[in-house]
Amino acid sequence: QPLVDLEGNLVENGGTYYLLPHIWALGGGIEAARTGKETCPLTVVQSPFEVSNGEPIRIASQFLSTFIPDGSPYAIGFANPPSCAASPWWTVVETSEGLAVKLLEHKTPEEDDTKFKFQKVSSPNRYVYNLSYCQREDDDLKCDQYIGIRRDAKGYRRLVVTNDNPLELVLVKANSPSQ
């Protein structure tokens, strides 16, 4: 099945969406924050405020398709990234907190290869997904590690690579009646 938003519509390749927790009381949408010694917001976090949609994100598949094909990995980035970021696209980097989802201040060749994949969750709401991180191993792309939340010492809800408690998300089209 192709990727669909909360209203059951196909997710558009290159389209702009909010990523929200499927249970309203578990925080808000996804956004960038300045953490640690960062001088600008490069860390991808979940808003602590349930009423916040976060920032709109863009989902882009390498396939020339108007929608996101089933099972394909894709790039995810902010539609309006901070000006200090070298690219809008998310990447995964090693931090003191483990593997974390971030924006980079300086462009690297590896950043262009970072891919993610939504995996459908068994839920009464048919449109709930986990987000997986995809790693290249030899010629294969393995998408077997989840993206979850880890609170840091200052209370930021950072998106990290984990095998425990994956984040369960819905996609809401930016500027849709559901937002």
Curated annotation (Swiss-Prot):
Q: Where is this site: Reactive bond for chymotrypsin?
A: 64-65
- Paired cysteines (S-S): 40-84, 134-143
Keywords per UniProt: Disulfide bond, Protease inhibitor, Pyrrolidone carboxylic acid, Serine protease inhibitor
Residue(s) carrying Pyrrolidone carboxylic acid: 1
Q: Which PROSITE patterns match?
A: SOYBEAN_KUNITZ
Q: Which Pfam families match?
A: Kunitz_legume
Its biological purpose: Inhibition of chymotrypsin.
The record's annotation in InterPro entries points to: Kunitz_inhibitor_STI-like_sf, Prot_inh_Kunz-lg
What is a single molecular function from GO for this protein? serine-type endopeptidase inhibitor activity
Domain of life of the native organism: Eukaryota
Q: What PANTHER family does the record tag this protein with?
A: KUNITZ TRYPSIN INHIBITOR 2, TRYPSIN INHIBITOR A
**SMART domains xrefs:** STI
Q: Which SUPFAM superfamilies match?
A: STI-like
Protein name listed in UniProt? Chymotrypsin inhibitor ECI
Which family does the record assign? Belongs to the protease inhibitor I3 (leguminous Kunitz-type inhibitor) family.
Q: Which CDD domains match?
A: beta-trefoil_STI_WCI3-like
